[in-house]
Amino acid sequence: MQTLRQQQPIVPSSPGHDPFLIVENVSKIYETPKGPYTVLDGVNLTVQEGEFICVIGHSGCGKSTLLNMVSGFNQPSHGSVRLKGKEIDRPGPDRMVVFQNYALLPWMTAYENVYLAVDCVNPQMREGEKREIVREHLAMVGLTEAAEKKITQISGGMKQRVAIARALSIRPEVLILDEPFGALDAITKEELQEELLKIWNDHRCTVLMITHDIDEALFLADRLVMMTNGPAANIGEIMTIPFPRPRDRERIMEDPQYYDLRNYALDFLYNRFAHDDE
């Protein structure tokens, strides 16, 4: 199995050009009454444009902290995070986040939630064009018939579809997913995984996704970033996932290599980097 050690040098994607996204020697330290607390220590990661990256690790290992720095919600204590060569120091419409708890406005309809994002990012766009973008993205996630329903009237799976439509409607370069399917039942989760892959294949934006589900990561990702435990967490290994695209779930699960990869990731999490209480 092909894995990359975390401390490998950062290699440009082509001569004279940085990779699309670079996390370089990033540490995050919080001041507490008991002294400095290091969440992340010297993290290095490069991501190419259009890649689908999953990040996995135990709770408290800094997965969300890392993605918050890519989204611009937080800044490194040391090191840098760069998108297309430019330092990330604040949130921006080139990076959109989908959260596990949806983060939708419940008094609005599905249509209005998506429209709000399009209107905020493109205030000068013609009204007809905005409405067409909203309709297009709701249709993309199968919610044309539910467009006028309020968020309180739809299921959890439908809410997450609205959140994905909203994020993609402003055409971000990076889609950041923080355990987007963690609260859903198994059937809905698999349906949304399939839809996400189809949408990603059509849009080809770069995706960074936190998950606790190894099977989900092996089905979705090009590479799986495996974090060590915190405090002072780091990237332990990066697993390259070899299955060709487009991916078929049944075919992948019949491949003996799938179980080798799955067992390797499980061993990393529960033997080599098991929690102290496990």
UniProtKB/Swiss-Prot annotation:
Q: What Gene Ontology terms for biological process does this UniProt record contain?
A: monoatomic ion transport
What is the name attached to this protein's record? Bicarbonate transport ATP-binding protein CmpD
Subcellular location, in the record's words?
Cell inner membrane
- Cite the PANTHER family for this sequence: NITRATE ABC TRANSPORTER ATP-BINDING PROTEIN, TAURINE IMPORT ATP-BINDING PROTEIN-RELATED
Keyword Nuclease among UniProt keywords: no
**Where does the ABC transporter domain start and stop, copy by copy?**
21-254
Query: What does the UniProt induction comment state?
Result: By carbon dioxide-limited conditions, probably via CmpR.
Which PROSITE patterns has this protein been placed in? ABC_TRANSPORTER_1, ABC_TRANSPORTER_2
Can you list the GO cellular component terms from the UniProt entry?
Answer: plasma membrane
General function of this protein: Part of the ABC transporter complex CmpABCD involved in bicarbonate transport. Responsible for energy coupling to the transport system.
